[in-house]
Amino acid sequence: MFGFRLFILAAVALAYIQCAAARMTVAHRLGARSLPTPENDPFYTPDDGWESAAPGTILKKREITVANSGVFQYGVRGFQLLYRTSGVNRGDASHTVTTVIIPENYDKDKLVSANMYEDSYSSNCAPSYSMRKGSKVFNDLANSYQMLFITTLLHEGWAVTVPDHEGPNNAFTSGRVEGHAILDGIRATLNYKKLGLNSDAKVIGYGYSGGALATGWAASLHSQYAHELNVAGWSMGGTVSNVTEWLGYIDNTTGAGFALASLGGLSSSYSELAWVQDNLTSKGRRLLDQSAQNCMYQNLWAVGKQKILDDSVFAGGSTFLQNDGALNILNKLTLGRFSKFVPIAPVFMFHATHDEVVPFNMAITTADAWCAQGAQIKFLSNTGSEMEHTNTELFNLPNVIFFMRDRFKGKDFGGQCQYPSSNDPWFNPQILGTSAAIYLQQVLDLIGNRIGGHDSILWDKVHSKQQP
């Protein structure tokens, strides 16, 4: 079984590389020009007076060509919306961009918010940049991989909105900022009349790892901040639900780059943590400046196994997690800590018990807290020794799709608090078969295959006597 999995993954990777080589050669011969990065693109700057607009208001819009890795043009329509959102607090005016992807024959009653794990302190890694044709080739490998899953959502006939949930300050791990950005991105997408989406369309949000952190906060803030949205469910895996615990866990490991990006994001979002950047050493300034130019994998490679919470990086670094002022902020970023911030739509969580990047106990503690507070939670534990952070996302993609289909169809969720376990999702023949079909389709999409529900959406509506 494990050898067969490796064979499938190797075949997909080989096809991806071959497609990439062909597309990159063509792009080079045509002299393709790179797009301006967000900090040099005036689209990302709102016009004067934007602060008075309501959250979710569209400030600018444009049509774009959607591509993976800057060169693989997808057979879809793409739009970008600059919209008003909120910062840490409801009254803090902010703005960000969402990329809306429309497949062929899409269902106007359904919308998915795909909340990518950007996990960086660089605006160059914003999905809205990396998802455009002409962006720097293979600018963000994490983004390139996640776009493969997005095409799977599009083939279901669902419109997808992809928010830059870190916002203009690259607020990685600033959960409330990211949650607001996701909810307002959904609002903006539904407000864009050109798409024709119904104002009460069912919405599902999904995120993994750092994207799960953002999704968890969107789920938590939904009832208080954007209760009018018709959210059918939330799905998240490898969830960073306790930033305080996570920073201590990943520091001085191969994931130390996450700690550095988190410090940058938190200190740029919270005035109470601005002292971190004010007290950087020369080494710390060099590391953070470098991080501001690097996407996730580049940052991990550059900073791996270094101690970031250390006085050699910033004064007070070694006692940062004991600092009362820092803890006052960090503890507010723990999912499940506050009873007023509880998901009101069903939540599907999944996590590997041997996750080496995000501790399992952190996520299940949040699930337990939400259940105790009345939320509907299904928490799937993957117990196989081979299940780790990266492959847990990959192997659970069919489970995420099944959850979304059921939620959109209005099926019974099956109970308030559910705690199933699975050794390895691929031991399930249905999961294995679905996975193989998904990976094959993703390769076809890279070479320009039309993406969407094709005629299936129309026929479903005709058979159910709905207006096509």
UniProtKB/Swiss-Prot annotation:
Induction: Constitutively expressed regardless of pH conditions or exposure time.
UniProt-annotated glycosylation sites, renumbered to this chain: 242, 252, 279
Pfam families from the UniProt entry: LIP
Localization in the cell: Secreted
One BP term from GO: lipid catabolic process
GO cellular component terms listed in the entry, alphabetical order: extracellular region
EC primary class: hydrolase
Gene3D superfamilies: 1.10.260.130, alpha/beta hydrolase (3.40.50.1820)
Catalysed reactions, semicolon-separated: a triacylglycerol + H2O = a diacylglycerol + a fatty acid + H(+); a monoacylglycerol + H2O = glycerol + a fatty acid + H(+); a diacylglycerol + H2O = a monoacylglycerol + a fatty acid + H(+)
EC number: 3.1.1.-, 3.1.1.3
Function: Secreted lipase that hydrolyzes acylglycerol lipids such as triacylglycerols and consequently releases free fatty acid. Due to an absence of fatty acid synthase genes in Malassezia species, secretory lipases are essential for the yeast to generate free fatty acids from degradation of sebum and assimilate them as lipid sources for growth. Plays important roles not only in lipid metabolism but also in the immune response of host cells and pathogenesis.
Annotated protein name in UniProt: Secreted triacylglycerol lipase LIP2
Species for this entry: Malassezia furfur (Pityriasis versicolor infection agent)
